[in-house]
Design a protein with these regions (language model features):
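Predominantly soluble domains enriched in secretory-pathway, periplasmic, or organellar proteins
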Residues: 1-186
Length: 186
């Protein structure tokens, strides 16, 4: 189950699921009606209704096998909803891929992007133009094209699950994103 907590009372308000296994990273849409979760041992994701509490779907990545991973111990540790809420991006650690699905039923698999290393997280620029898997790539989200592989001053790949986007105006921060690939329509 995914437990929804009330932060005023510090109690569990409701449970979503049950899902097929333990819940790993998840993302929600901006209207807080759908949750897309990764679960233990599934190369793919499951969908829950945040209002009714029901599990709605289980979606497997097609054409790829799950296998051993170096980090997180789970084939799909990392999932993001594009800011326009049209796509779900799912990390695949074993195959070093990002799998892209429609965010609407029946959640069709659209394409797969090869990465340079094992992804464990994905987020997007606030405008949705770029995707940032934790493996260090900068991907043009619409074209599904890897534009850059981030490197440090010693030409080592820079990879991280922690990322923040900050917009400045006249030297002052005026807006910021976060490390979570969540819907931003509302």
């Amino acid at each position: 189950f995914l437990h929804v907590a009330n932060t005023k009372t510090h109690t569990v308000d409701r449970k979503i699921g049950p899902f097929s296994a333990g819940v790993r990273p998840f993302t929600i849409d901006s209207s807080e009606t759908r949750v897309f979760v990764t679960v233990n041992e599934l190369l793919g994701f499951e969908v829950g209704d945040l209002k009714s509490g029901e599990k709605l779907a289980s979606v497997k990545v097609l054409g790829w096998d799950k296998g051993p991973v170096r980090r997180h111990g789970n084939p799909s540790h990392g999932i993001g909803l594009t800011p326009d809420e049209k796509e779900i991006w799912v990390c695949d650690g074993h195959n070093m891929r990002m799998h892209i699905f429609s965010a609407q039923p029946p959640y069709l698999q659209q394409t797969t992007i090869p990465l340079s290393d094992m992804p464990g997280w994905v987020t997007f620029s606030m405008d949705g133009q770029y995707a940032y898997p934790s493996s260090g790539e900068v991907i043009h989200a619409r074209r599904r094209e890897v534009l850059y592989l981030l490197k440090d001053e010693h030409h080592n790949t820079v990879s991280s699950e922690k990322m923040v986007e900050i917009f400045k105006k006249e030297g002052k921060a005026v807006a910021n994103g976060d490390q979570f690939g969540v819907g931003r329509l509302h």
